[in-house]
């Protein structure tokens, strides 16, 4: 459809694009965010994440198994790691 036909239909096909950002501003903001992460203790190694399932809520959760994993919805300790077959069965609180 050409622009003349579109204007006959009452459609506005003009695209307003904002001017591009200065690349120096992008570099400055990304380096400052890295500094703030390091100040907050985020500069350490990344924790490995696993996908587990809660049989109570019938919901999947992405979590780290290093700490005490719980379902965010029902606070249950019973989480099933369905990819590797490991079960983290503990008493429900």
From Swiss-Prot:
Residues 23-36 have a biased composition (Low complexity). Keywords: Ethylene signaling pathway, Stress response. Disruption phenotype: Increased sensitivity to salt. It comes from the Eukaryota. Residues 23-46 are annotated as: Disordered. The keyword Ion transport does not apply. One of its GO terms (biological process) is response to salt stress. Triggered by EIN3. Involved in ethylene-dependent salt stress responses by reducing reactive oxygen species (ROS) accumulation. This is Protein salt-induced and EIN3/EIL1-dependent 1. It comes from Arabidopsis thaliana (Mouse-ear cress).
């Amino acid at each position: 459809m050409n622009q003349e036909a579109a204007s006959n239909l009452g459609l506005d096909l003009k695209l307003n694009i904002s001017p591009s950002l200065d690349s120096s501003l992008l570099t400055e903001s990304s380096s400052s965010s890295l500094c703030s992460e390091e100040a907050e203790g985020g500069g350490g190694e990344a924790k490995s994440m696993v996908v587990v399932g809660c049989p109570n809520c019938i919901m999947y959760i992405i979590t780290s198994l290093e700490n005490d994993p719980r379902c965010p919805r029902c606070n249950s300790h019973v989480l099933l790691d369905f990819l590797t077959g490991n079960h983290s069965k503990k008493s429900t609180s």
